Amino acid sequence: MPLDLALKRKYYEEVRPELIRRFGYQNVWEVPRLEKVVINQGLGEAKEDARILEKAAQELALITGQKPAVTRAKKSISNFKLRKGMPIGLRVTLRRDRMWIFLEKLLNVALPRIRDFRGLNPNSFDGRGNYNLGLREQLIFPEITYDMVDALRGMDIAVVTTAETDEEARALLELLGFPFRK
């Protein structure tokens, strides 16, 4: 039996028809849709201690349900004591059902757990219909308990859409339930 992905169902049953009405698309393939969600964690301190990378990878795998890929330094920078090829971060690309599961968890559980949360910044679109947000700590996700955490690590989340303008992307994400600041 397939998973019941409420957010995915909402997209097909409510959001897509509303976007067609609002922007007057001729074809359903013109309607903006979510392509992927990329979660990135920069771990500069991992160059001194490999255990930091392992612990962060374990936490990110719990949050996303997928093993993260290690990102490595493209070139050496002596001021940062960095050599080409050193592991300096983690990245996970979520598509299809895992993407919908992650977004549902982000919107319904994680974001409401942020202290003093007043909404997402509506200016964080990149001009090409993609949205980026940064989180300061991994504790807001239900899979991470306080006892597991050795250090607070933030992450960047990029929501990649097929929208061609920020206006279309914002309409898509608002209809999906992203809580933007007014």
Curated annotation (Swiss-Prot):
UniProt keyword annotations, A-Z: Ribonucleoprotein, Ribosomal protein, RNA-binding, rRNA-binding, tRNA-binding
GO terms under cellular component: ribonucleoprotein complex; ribosome
Family matches, as InterPro entries: Ribosomal_uL5, Ribosomal_uL5_bac-type, Ribosomal_uL5_C, Ribosomal_uL5_CS, Ribosomal_uL5_dom_sf, Ribosomal_uL5_N
Molecular function terms from GO: rRNA binding; structural constituent of ribosome; tRNA binding
Function in brief: This is one of the proteins that bind and probably mediate the attachment of the 5S RNA into the large ribosomal subunit, where it forms part of the central protuberance. In the 70S ribosome it contacts protein S13 of the 30S subunit (bridge B1b), connecting the 2 subunits; this bridge is implicated in subunit movement. Contacts the P site tRNA; the 5S rRNA and some of its associated proteins might help stabilize positioning of ribosome-bound tRNAs.
Subunit composition and interactions: Part of the 50S ribosomal subunit; part of the 5S rRNA/L5/L18/L25 subcomplex. Contacts the 5S rRNA and the P site tRNA. Forms a bridge to the 30S subunit in the 70S ribosome.
GO terms of biological process kind: translation
A Pfam family reported for this protein in Swiss-Prot or TrEMBL: Ribosomal_L5_C
Protein name: Large ribosomal subunit protein uL5
Coiled-coil region: none
Entries under HAMAP family matching the protein: Ribosomal_uL5_B
Alphabetized Gene3D superfamilies for the sequence: 3.30.1440.10
Organism expressing this protein natively: Thermus thermophilus (strain ATCC BAA-163 / DSM 7039 / HB27)
Top-rank lineage group of the source organism: Bacteria
